[in-house]
Regions:
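A short acidic (Asp/Glu
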Residues: 222-224
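Flexible, low-complexity junctional segments that flank or bridge functional domains
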Residues: 1-213, 218-220
Length: 224
């Protein structure tokens, strides 16, 4: 209650609510705020979003696309702090606002790596500008405002499946099943998923496949 007063903005209130909801530890319990990236991108001004594409890897935050700040930072630069807040402390703060089943850090990391352009501004109170300190750099770098929304790093080469469900024989002993979505329910398209699994298992059995790889990268779960 002490955090909320007559000067509290919508963004601040929503961020506080997220922390309360996230404390439940259930990925199916969330506010509309931050649950749907498309909704958030429609109401957050472009100039308020974080202007770099970044990725959190092993508790380190790296630039994977400098966007319109290519003259200031480079791909693979490690960001040590943003607006004076150490990266580790910033991530810890953001994690407290992400709903995840049993507070899974793996899920929270994936969520951050998807919605970083929104979560970083929320955590910092929507600053008018962003300044970063990068490893190996002496001076703080003031970033230019976003001229397009920074999106999650996606390498199309990692997913050669044209559809959501694919079976591929790599060699005589190995096969790969790609499942890009679990959006198959009994009242909708569950028969499609079941038929795919059944037919794939039949092919694998008939081909005497010994090694099966199940690829669920970029699978956001159900209701996607």
């Amino acid at each position: 209650k002490l955090l909320i007063n007559e000067k509290t903005t919508y963004a601040e209130f929503a961020w506080h609510c997220n922390a309360i909801i996230a404390s439940i530890g259930c990925s199916h319990t969330a506010s509309s705020n931050m649950q749907n990236a498309y909704h958030e991108l429609s109401i957050v001004p472009l100039e308020k979003t974080f202007p770099l594409t970044v990725r959190l890897i092993n508790d380190q935050l790296f630039v994977v696309n400098p966007m319109n700040n290519a003259d200031k930072v480079n791909v693979k630069d490690e960001i040590l702090s943003i607006n004076g807040v150490e990266t580790s402390k910033l991530i810890t703060s953001i994690y407290k606002h992400i709903s995840a089943q049993a507070n899974s850090e793996t899920y929270k990391r994936q969520k951050f790596n998807t919605y970083f352009a929104l979560m970083i501004p929320y955590a910092l109170g929507f600053p008018t500008s962003f300044e970063v300190n990068c490893k190996g750099r002496v001076n703080t770098i003031k970033l230019k405002q976003s001229n397009e929304y920074a999106r999650e790093l996606y390498d199309p080469s990692e997913n050669v499946c044209a559809d959501n469900l694919c079976l591929e024989k790599v060699d005589a002993n190995t096969a790969v099943i790609t499942i890009s979505s679990f959006n198959y329910y009994e009242w909708d398209s569950y028969p499609v998923f079941k038929a795919f699994v059944d037919s794939s298992m039949k092919v694998i059995h008939q081909s005497n496949i010994k090694n099966l790889i199940i690829d669920v990268r970029y699978n956001g779960g159900g209701s996607q």
